[in-house]
Amino acid sequence: MTVASVEQMFSGKIQVGSEVTVRGWVRTRRDSKAGLSFVSVSDGSCFAAIQVVTPAHLPNYETEVRKLTTGCAVIVIGTLAPSLGQGQQFEIQAQSIEVVGWVEDPETYPIQPKQHSLEFLREVAHLRPRTNLFGAVARIRHCLSQAVHRFFHENGYYWITTPIITTSDAEGAGQMFRVSTLDLVNLPRTETGGIDFSHDFFGKETFLTVSGQLNVEAYALALSKVYTFGPTFRAENSHTPRHLAEFWMIEPEIAFADLAEDARVAEQFLKFLFKTVLEERTDDLAFITERVEKTTISKLEGFIKSPFERIEYTDAIKLLERSGKKFDFPVEWGLDLQTEHERWLTEKHIGRPVVVTNYPEHIKAFYMRLNDDGKTVAAMDVLAPGIGEIIGGSQREERLEMLDIRMAQFGLDPTHYQWYRDFRRYGSVPHAGFGLGFERLMVYVCGLSNIRDAIPYPRAPSSAEF
């Protein structure tokens, strides 16, 4: 007898006529006039559930099988057979059904066999993976996570695990969560009345990381090609459907690379991810295309086929100014591009993904390399139709004197970044990298309208349940 997953059965890995054991949860059950029950069982291994044909002569048919409701856990032993019903390839002809776990009160069970609103499902995030949509999202998230590691491994990168607790603000924006074990009722004070963090666990003020980039640069300058992929945190009090307080970031870093090489890798990387998910999660993407976003599959296929357009920020501003379109946000050299500007460029004017380069120095981070014009930095944003910015990156400032000037402009204390300055003192080389918010990627692939649906347990202002 073979313990088999539903995915193995539908992919032909289990021979028809084999005796199998399947373990999963009931989606639906219905009785027939012929004295049978049809129980739909899902184990989460793929989008589909398998129909279990249950005859009335089973010893627990009346006492248990006919009382099964959505969510009950069962172990089924039976024979895999071609299905006589429409819309399904196989079924299991049951020899026994063991009920492992009952749903305590079927009437109040939150996940009923009907369509629920996304707002409601966020309130029961611990149960929402049992729905069709969030089961699909979870499998796609796994597929893309594995594809991230596969791409970098196959291209000679090393995965570096960067710290979650840090003393540095990688973005220089100050939107950080403080980490402390101090007694909030009896805080130690300095002579000037400030909090004395020398009494804290680490002996200094510490935070949750906003980016692994600064740390991973150290390894790029020793191992040449590296990346980090882990959780990051931003204490940005934003309630929009585009922001999370906790999210995952993919950040490669490449030694001896300039901005052009950075953009080339970003394009290659995104196309690899989309090609992989199209090949490996066909069933889940088909459901999303049917129920969530009808252009999902064609959008990803078009992205893969399209060469990325390259355009400088200055030229992008000129195009927007000449567009004749009235935008909600002003278009002016020196201001950052907003989502509406990015989407106009990719969807209305150019019609494919765009890499915008060389932004004004005052709207980008301190570590980005100052260009020879003294006004712009070697920064890039990859813009995608339907979402806008999906990747942000830059060539890093490898010149110590210029880095110090940039840090001073941002009001950063150089003593907190002495270790980062060391990279420029000892064998400095040009290097570049980018960041891709994993949940932003998930939103794009799955056609989601709210980023809180792209992560298992969303963390946002006034929201830290489960």
Swiss-Prot record:
Chain's gene name: asnS
Family (UniProt): Belongs to the class-II aminoacyl-tRNA synthetase family.
A Pfam family hit: tRNA-synt_2
Subunit structure: Homodimer.
Catalytic activity from the UniProt record: tRNA(Asn) + L-asparagine + ATP = L-asparaginyl-tRNA(Asn) + AMP + diphosphate + H(+)
Entry keywords, A to Z: Aminoacyl-tRNA synthetase, ATP-binding, Cytoplasm, Ligase, Nucleotide-binding, Protein biosynthesis
Protein name per its UniProtKB record: Asparagine--tRNA ligase
Gene Ontology BP terms: asparaginyl-tRNA aminoacylation
Organism, scientific name: Xylella fastidiosa (strain 9a5c)
Primary enzyme class: ligase
A GO molecular-function annotation: ATP binding
Record's subcellular location: Cytoplasm
EC number(s) given by UniProt: 6.1.1.22
Keyword Aminoacyl-tRNA synthetase belongs to the record: yes
NCBIfam families named in the record: asnS, PRK03932.1
CC annotations in GO: cytoplasm
Highest taxon, organism lineage: Bacteria
